[in-house]
Amino acid sequence: MKVLGSVRGAFAAALLLALVSALPGAARAAQLEVKIDNFTFGPQKLTVKVGDTVTWINEDDIPHTVVSTGHFRSKALDTDDKYAFTFTTAGTFEYFCGLHPHMQGSIVVETATGSAATQ
């Protein structure tokens, strides 16, 4: 009888875990991409949530960097290289290519409630 009770308890715990992880509030952080091509970042402006990771992918034939002064800085990215950054605070993060400063973009990071403070 004791074994049957512990099996039922384990089953109930597994069922509860499955139900909780299926709830909308249990969503995981998103993986988002910005393409670098033809001397542009695309999309040029991206809105994400706190905890999301943005990955920049260089699809251009020449090296580029991703720089947000005081926040993040990639190494020179050759063709097909990637750089990822996880945003842990809300705000607007302006960035540019350190090799080609006319290339600019921004990431707007919102809290779960949708607000973004200026960085």
Question: What is the role of each PLM region?
Answer:
Residues 2-8, 18, 22-119:
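Extracytoplasmic copper-binding redox domains, predominantly the cupredoxin/blue-copper superfamily
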